[in-house]
């Protein structure tokens, strides 16, 4: 099996091979090393991230493991499903609520003044109990409005004498719970079909769930420490045996991983006496150090590890930065060289435990020299970038693209007096993330040539992006930027699918789309019904001039970094769901997808194989490559 995986890794430069590799990663975790001996753990949940950071075909595959704990953190829980209010002449269905009965009685008070007076005078406590509602009504002399379930009303003739009773149709709806509909007209009522939606858009638009980007950039920290975790191979999979820090100590333990981690945490706690936040600086730590430690993280140790953050029970916080994501693809030694420190080699990861034991002294010495070099390079780079990209600070970001683009957006915002906002809560963040589609849309499986947008940067830098807080609207306004919850119906005739959906047998589905994607879908023949939207009244003007100025400034400081960064931005606009400019990424990807579709419109559909927001596969038999394809590059 190892030989099979090694062969797949060496040839993982096309869609088919990568998909085969994914199938194996459902069962195995690949233990690999780069050319500097840096350990890399590749598993089902992180392979896309690894491929976006490096060429996996040149990695050395050391082994496989079944260790199922090596997985990403659980996804954000699904938001509570939502049903909007429906006020029909025959019935009233309140919007999703923990207390739908209270909503119904308040609705009745709009028509019955005596109920309104009692509510104003006495109030009513929240409850989902019909008997408690009826007890309150009786105590206020309003028993004539008592609540009766529809089923009971139909079974018992006695209720029919009391025409003012509040008849409610009760039901239980998955992911929502108990729901009640007030039946206004018994003769015409039939239980309605109600759209159960994944988001409450009006709730998501609340001001307190959005903050201006500039307000999140004014942060300070006291201490920075370079750190590296080293792993050895055992019969039971990889284990951490050494944690090195600079400036600081090196912790080694071959007998107990738990004690190794606890010693490290005790040391961290001791140095945090004068600050509540410190920064740990690693290199490729997201691909090895953090996932490996997460597997062996002790229970009840007073610290929780989540993604790249350690949080103590008393509120102290440790941010673990992966500086590789600020290196623009440089090796560790090249990164250190280009930022002015002496390059030092580091110990190889994933060596045998017996070899690590035998060479502990030299490994510790080598590790400390490497970390000193990393620390000095990071201090130089962070100081330089924080001046050039003020007020952005490196530790506020997870990668250099986010920092660079945020600084550009912030500069344009300051020049125009309009700021970009970001969601401060998981649910609006999830709503924005849901509008992003990075998946390939498969049309057919014919042999094809792959084309990529020549410059993503050129496309996205000349467009407009949302400014200010969003407003809730039932339907978006043409010409304004918005993100809408949509009911999508695919065309009945032969068509190229432009809206991604994972169920080919469904012709109508609900999804989240940007206003840009909605325009593209309608052009492609889709029917779109908007079910609520976040809309922005103002736009940040195009970023092109400010972006070019920023590139020139950084180029004067470090040409290698700038050239590599520019290459990344030209080829990619990889979405980062933890970024404070997630709104920018959302619309940038939509603009790219609209561009790809404009190219597809010029090609006979029979030749289109598959596509994403930045790539297009065209049949090898297609000879008529038109002028519009000049904006694409053949790979």
From Swiss-Prot:
Q: Which family does it belong to?
A: Belongs to the orthopoxvirus OPG056 family.
Its chief place of residence is virion
Query: Per its record, what triggers expression of this gene product?
Result: Expressed in the early phase of the viral replicative cycle.
Where in the cell is the protein located?
Answer: Virion membrane; Host endosome
What is the name of this protein?
A: Protein OPG056
Transmembrane ranges? none
Alphabetically ordered keywords of this record: Early protein, Host endosome, Host-virus interaction, Membrane, Microtubular outwards viral transport, Viral release from host cell, Virion, Virulence
Q: Which gene encodes it?
A: OPG056
Function comment:
Plays a role in intracellular enveloped virus (IEV) transport to the cell surface through microtubule transport. Together with protein OPG064, forms a complex that interacts with host KLC2 (kinesin light chain isoform 2) to engage the kinesin-1 complex and thereby promote IEV trafficking.
Q: What top-level branch of life does the organism fall under?
A: Viruses
> What cystine linkages occur within this chain?
none
Q: Name one GO cellular component term.
A: virion membrane
From the broadest rank down, the organism's phylogenetic lineage runs: Viruses, Varidnaviria, Bamfordvirae, Nucleocytoviricota, Pokkesviricetes
Subunit structure of this chain's protein: Interacts with protein OPG164. Interacts with protein OPG064.
Q: Name one GO biological process term.
A: microtubule-dependent intracellular transport of viral material towards cell periphery
């Amino acid at each position: 099996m190892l030989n099979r995986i090694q062969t797949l890794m060496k040839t993982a430069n096309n869609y088919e091979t990568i998909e085969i590799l994914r199938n194996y990663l459902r069962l195995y975790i690949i233990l690999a090393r780069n050319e500097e001996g840096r350990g890399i753990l590749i598993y089902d949940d992180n392979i896309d991230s690894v491929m976006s950071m490096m060429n996996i075909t040149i990695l050395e595959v050391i082994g496989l493991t079944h260790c199922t704990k090596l997985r990403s953190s659980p996804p954000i829980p699904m938001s509570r499903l939502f049903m909007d209010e429906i006020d029909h002449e025959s019935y009233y269905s309140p919007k999703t609520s923990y207390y739908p009965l209270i909503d119904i009685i308040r609705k009745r008070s709009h028509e019955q003044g005596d109920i309104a007076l009692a509510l104003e005078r006495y109030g009513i406590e929240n409850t989902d109990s019909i008997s408690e509602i009826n007890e309150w009504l009786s105590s206020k002399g309003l028993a004539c409005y008592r609540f009766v379930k529809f089923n009971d009303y139909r079974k018992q003739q006695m209720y029919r004498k009391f025409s003012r009773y509040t008849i409610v149709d009760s039901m239980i709806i998955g992911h929502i719970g108990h729901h009640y509909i007030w039946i206004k007209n018994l003769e015409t009522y039939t239980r309605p079909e109600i759209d159960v939606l994944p988001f409450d858009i009006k709730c998501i638009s609340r001001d307190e769930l959005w903050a201006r980007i500039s307000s999140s950039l004014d942060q300070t920290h006291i201490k920075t420490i370079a750190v590296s975790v080293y792993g050895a191979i055992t019969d039971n999979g990889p284990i951490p045996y050494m944690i090195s820090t600079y400036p600081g100590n090196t912790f080694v333990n071959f007998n107990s991983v738990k004690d190794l981690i606890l010693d490290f945490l005790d040391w961290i706690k001791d140095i945090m006496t004068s600050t509540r936040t410190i920064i740990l600086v690693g290199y490729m730590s997201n691909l090895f150090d953090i996932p490996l430690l997460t597997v062996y993280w002790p229970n009840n140790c007073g610290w929780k590890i989540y993604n790249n953050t350690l949080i103590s029970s008393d509120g102290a916080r440790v941010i673990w930065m992966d500086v590789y994501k600020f290196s623009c693809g440089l090796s560790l030694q090249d990164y250190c060289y280009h930022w002015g420190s002496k390059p030092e080699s580091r110990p190889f990861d994933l060596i045998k435990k017996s070899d690590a034991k035998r060479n502990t002294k030299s490994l510790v010495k080598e590790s400390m020299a490497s970390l000193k070099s990393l620390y000095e390079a990071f201090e130089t780079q962070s100081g330089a970038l924080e001046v050039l990209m003020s007020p952005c600070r490196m530790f506020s970001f997870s990668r250099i693209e986010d920092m660079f683009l945020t600084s550009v957006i912030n500069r344009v915002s300051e020049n125009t007096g309009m700021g970009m906002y970001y969601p401060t809560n998981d649910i609006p963040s999830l709503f924005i993330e849901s509008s992003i589609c990075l998946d390939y849309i498969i049309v057919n499986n014919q042999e094809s040539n792959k084309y990529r947008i020549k410059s993503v940067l050129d496309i996205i830098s000349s467009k407009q992006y949302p400014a200010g807080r969003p407003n809730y609207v039932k339907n978006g306004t043409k010409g304004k930027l918005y993100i809408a919850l949509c009911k999508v119906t695919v065309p009945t005739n032969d068509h190229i699918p432009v809206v991604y959906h994972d169920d080919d047998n469904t012709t109508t589905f609900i999804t989240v789309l940007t206003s840009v994607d909605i325009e593209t879908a309608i052009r492609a023949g889709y029917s779109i019904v908007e079910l609520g939207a976040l809309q922005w009244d103002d736009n940040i003007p195009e970023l092109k001039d400010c972006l070019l100025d920023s590139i020139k400034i950084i180029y004067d400081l470090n040409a290698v970094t700038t050239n590599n960064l520019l290459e990344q931005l030209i080829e990619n606009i990889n979405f980062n769901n933890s970024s404070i400019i997630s709104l920018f990424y959302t619309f940038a990807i939509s603009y790219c997808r609209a561009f790809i579709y404009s190219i597809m419109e010029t090609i006979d559909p029979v030749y289109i194989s598959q596509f994403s927001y930045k790539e297009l596969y065209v049949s090898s038999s297609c000879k008529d490559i038109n002028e519009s394809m000049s904006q694409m590059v053949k790979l």
